């Protein structure tokens, strides 16, 4: 999306819903186009029987947004999606500056310049493009990376900002539909969650020193209670000092901001949201998430809390009262619900092991809820890439949707065709034929092997009484019958 290369040889092929085929690979090293501009990518577009050669992928053939959600603690997606693009663009800009210095006689000529043959005009155009990409990373990031830690920022956005324009002619209908889907999301967990408020603890010094990114400007304006010339309603701001000391010995300042949810009647149903945040973020919950994530990663937000009531019960609950599985369910499926057409017509979701922390009952409903939450109007251009080891999730996937990645030697990953269709297949068959795994644990398997060698019918019968139903119990019973028959023949 930034015309950057991953650092290895690759070929990328995909097809759009309208039939357009896109083929991408790296250009030859040092390649320049007719204008003298150095190019990194070779792109072919095949549409209506015609092929067009380009040097970048047009925006209309890229996702409006990429949302990456990784469950593991050892994920490198943050480096790949957030830090690496910025570092790569900075490196390109540095290389261009060296080439310009050499051209102007201000730098040494090494004979190994990165941009040989590139004209000064082309270098200037390249520099402007790099700066525009760099600015877009800050101003309107198209990639959001979330994990178990940052899941806490999803719940406030899910209830504060609804993904549509409040001036829409069909606002009541859309709000009711959205509220119904949110309720369905919660009902699956048997929770009657009614949002009360969310709050932020802000490090004033970090906020003052933070780079002047749009997200930081948004946060500063929110905390100043001056949003588009109006005071921020349903928000309590309290500034205080902490026990921490600044470098000059003064007490560090902190700001606590509490955002109170409101309910709005839509055809007799209560729809909870935050009116001012809804207007300020123009119906884009992802703009709110981006602001919160940026401030969190820069150390500006020290804490975030979310308070709710559970039905008619007295008292408030905190986000920490949810189990890991409950929070992960609301976060992973909630992201899909928020990605409605108002926020972009197509979003690419990269989900790594999305069933982590789920019990089997929730995993069984994961794919069903992906389809149910994807679009409120029945149309969606969203795509999902899901990495999983769950045989239960695979029972909801068609054979054409699955790619099996194997790394038998530990050095080269291979993509293989599935031997069976997993859709509605038995989990034992999937576990054995797809993952090459046994249907029982290793300890149980060793125990069964020992029992199959048992020659005392009484000992074997006693052991069988402790074995659960299934094929292994059947094997042991067959072995017991064989021993009893053998003993009868000996006695006879």
What does each model-identified segment do?
Residues 1-9, 283-288, 294-445:
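Switch/communication elements of ASCE P-loop NTPase nucleotide-binding domains
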Residues 38-53, 326-338:
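A Trp-anchored, charged/polar loop motif used as the substrate-binding/catalytic surface
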Residues 50-53, 57-67, 73-192, 196-210, ...:
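Acidic, Mg2+-coordinating catalytic modules of nucleic-acid enzymes
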Residues 69-70, 352:
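Conserved beta-strand segments of the P-loop GTPase G domain that flank and frequently precede/overlap
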Residues 108-115, 121-124, 128-134, 152-154, ...:
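Extended helical coiled-coil dimerization/tether regions that scaffold
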Residues 35-49, 276-280, 288-292:
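Long, contiguous juxta-domain segments that are non-catalytic but functionally important
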Residues 1-36, 48:
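Conserved P-loop NTP-binding catalytic core
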Residues 13-15, 25-27, 44-46, 147, ...:
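A structural detector for beta-sheet-dominated domains
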């Amino acid at each position: 999306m930034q015309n950057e290369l991953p650092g290895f040889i690759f070929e990328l092929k995909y097809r759009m819903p309208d039939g357009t085929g896109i083929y991408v690979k790296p250009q030859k090293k040092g390649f320049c186009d007719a204008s003298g501009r150095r190019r990194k990518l070779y792109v072919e577009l095949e549409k209506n029987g015609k092929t067009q050669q380009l040097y970048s992928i047009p925006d209309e053939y890229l996702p409006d947004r990429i949302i990456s959600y990784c469950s593991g603690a050892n994920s490198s997606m943050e480096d790949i999606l957030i830090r690496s693009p910025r570092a790569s663009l900075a490196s390109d800009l540095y290389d261009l500056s060296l080439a310009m210095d050499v051209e102007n006689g201000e730098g040494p000529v090494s004979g190994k310049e990165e941009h040989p043959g590139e004209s000064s005009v082309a270098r200037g155009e390249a520099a402007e493009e790099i700066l525009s990409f760099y600015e877009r990373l800050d101003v309107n990031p198209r990639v959001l990376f979330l994990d178990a830690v940052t899941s806490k920022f999803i719940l406030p956005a899910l209830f504060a900002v609804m993904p549509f324009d409040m001036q829409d002619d069909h606002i009541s209908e859309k709000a009711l539909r959205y509220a119904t889907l949110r309720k369905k999301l919660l009902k699956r967990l048997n929770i009657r969650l009614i949002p009360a408020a969310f709050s932020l603890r802000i490090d004033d010094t970090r906020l003052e020193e933070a780079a002047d990114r749009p997200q930081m400007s948004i946060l500063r304006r929110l905390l100043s209670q001056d949003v588009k010339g109006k005071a921020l309603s349903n928000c309590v701001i309290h500034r205080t000092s902490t026990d921490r000391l600044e470098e000059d010995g003064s007490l560090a300042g902190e700001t606590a901001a509490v955002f109170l949810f409101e309910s709005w009647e839509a055809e007799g149903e209560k729809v909870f949201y935050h009116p001012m945040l809804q207007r300020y973020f123009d119906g884009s919950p992802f703009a709110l998430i981006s602001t919160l994530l940026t401030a969190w990663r820069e150390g500006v937000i020290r804490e975030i809390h979310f308070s709710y009531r559970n039905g008619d019960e007295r008292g408030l609950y905190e986000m920490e009262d949810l189990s890991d599985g409950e929070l992960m369910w609301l976060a992973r499926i909630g992201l899909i619900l928020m990605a409605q057409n108002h926020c972009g017509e197509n979003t690419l979701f990269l989900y790594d092991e999305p069933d982590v922390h789920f019990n089997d009952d929730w995993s069984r409903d994961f794919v069903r809820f992906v389809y149910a939450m994807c679009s409120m109007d029945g149309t969606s251009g969203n795509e999902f890439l899901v990495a999983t080891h769950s045989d239960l999730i695979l029972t909801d996937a068609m054979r054409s949707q699955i790619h099996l990645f194997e790394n038998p030697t530990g050095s080269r990953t291979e993509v293989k065709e599935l031997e069976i269709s997993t859709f509605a297949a038995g989990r034992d068959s999937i576990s054995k034929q797809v993952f090459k795994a046994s249907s029982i644990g290793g300890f149980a398997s060793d125990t069964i092997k020992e029992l199959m060698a048992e020659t005392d019918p009484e000992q074997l019968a006693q052991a069988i009484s402790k074995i659960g139903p299934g094929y292994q119990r059947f094997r042991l019973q067959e072995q017991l019958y064989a021993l009893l028959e053998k003993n009868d023949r000996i006695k006879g």
